Design a protein with these regions (language model features):
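C-terminal functional extensions of proteins
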Residues: 111-153
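Cofactor-cradling patches in redox/metallo enzymes
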Residues: 33-37, 41, 46-114, 121-130
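Generic serine detector
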Residues: 6, 10, 20, 41, ...
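Structural signal for hydrophobic packing residues in well-ordered secondary-structure cores
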Residues: 13, 80-84, 139-146
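Residue-identity detector for threonine
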Residues: 3, 17, 28, 67-69, ...
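N-terminal, charge-rich interaction modules
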Residues: 1-58
């Protein structure tokens, strides 16, 4: 009986963790302003269970906004390794996805070469219209990364 209750509680905790995203964001470019809009009154990401966190050890989704340089890549990987499971990565903006204006530069690394990226939000900087588009291009329908773009229309 004790193991049955323990398994049920464990399953409930995993489900709650999966659908309660606590994202810090790694701001290295202008896309950081757009993430601020997510937590503002217009989009109110908190109604979907997303709370902005300052500590990476309590977060389970990392939003990369901007370029990752060669020097910064090992630190970004270290940050990702500190996050608890389940953990997700979102590449936001042209700089994080392909390099933006720095494309082809010797010191720039796309986010997908450093970490496993689960969702992409395109644009420079991504507009509010770009986030719903990411719902259709991202991972499966049950992915918590889809919460970034709010309810589908």
């Amino acid at each position: 009986m004790k193991t049955l209750v323990s398994q049920a509680v464990s399953r409930l905790a995993r489900w709650g963790t999966k659908w309660s995203l606590w994202p810090p964001h790694l701001v290295t470019a202008c896309c950081g302003v757009e993430v601020g809009h997510l937590f503002g009154s217009a989009y109110d990401a908190e109604r979907f269970g997303m709370l902005p966190m300052g500590s990476l050890r309590q977060s389970n989704i990392l939003i990369i906004e901007g370029t990752i340089t060669l020097k910064m890549a090992k630190f970004v990987k270290y940050i990702y390794e500190q996050m608890p499971e389940p953990k997700y990565v979102v590449a936001m903006g042209a700089c994080a996805i392909k390099g933006g204006v720095f494309y082809g530069s010797y010191h720039m690394v796309p986010a997908a070469k450093v970490l496993p990226v689960h969702a992409y939000v395109s644009g420079c900087p991504p507009t509010p219209e770009g986030r719903p588009k990411s719902r259709d291009e991202g991972p499966g329908a049950d992915s918590p990364c889809r919460k970034l773009s709010g309810p589908s229309t």
